[in-house]
């Protein structure tokens, strides 16, 4: 079955490179994508959780910072987890295969995004 997604948005925070116990590079970050409803209507912003592994994670952490526009290509995946009360939860993430610059270095318009806890 087909499971492909391409998403462009601005990084809400600087991505941080981590390593698994076996030394594999990984980063997870959130991107903001404006949704435009039409002329004269206010834009709304959607936020997407993104995960990248290995050399893709290293590339993103080296060249992208908060506010930079990024375009990612990959697939959607679900991840199950338990909250503090022990309830089962599910998150949907974009698992990145490729990442691309979607702005020029001159366009360092960082943008003001609300903190994650403001949604």
Give the residues covered by each predicted segment.
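OB-fold and OB-like beta-barrel modules that bind single-stranded nucleic acids
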Residues: 5-11, 31, 65-77, 96-99
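Beta-rich strand-turn-strand
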Residues: 53-89
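Short coil/loop residues immediately preceding or within conserved phosphate-binding loops
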Residues: 2, 6, 12, 26, ...
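Short aromatic-glycine-enriched beta-strand elements
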Residues: 19-32, 90
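OB-fold/S1-family single-stranded nucleic acid-binding modules
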Residues: 50, 83-103
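Glycine-rich strand-loop-strand elements at beta-sheet edges
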Residues: 35-63
């Amino acid at each position: 079955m087909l499971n492909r997604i391409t998403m462009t948005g601005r990084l809400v925070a600087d991505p941080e490179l981590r390593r698994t116990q076996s030394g594999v590079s990984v980063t997870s970050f959130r991107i903001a994508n404006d949704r435009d409803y039409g002329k004269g209507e206010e834009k709304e912003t959607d936020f997407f959780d993104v995960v990248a592994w290995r050399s893709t994670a290293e590339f993103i952490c080296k060249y992208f910072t908060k506010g930079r526009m990024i375009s990612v290509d990959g697939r959607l995946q679900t991840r199950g987890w338990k909250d503090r009360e022990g309830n089962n939860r599910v998150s949907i993430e974009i698992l990145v295969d490729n990442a691309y610059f979607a702005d020029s270095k001159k366009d360092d318009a960082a943008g003001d995004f609300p903190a994650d806890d403001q949604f």
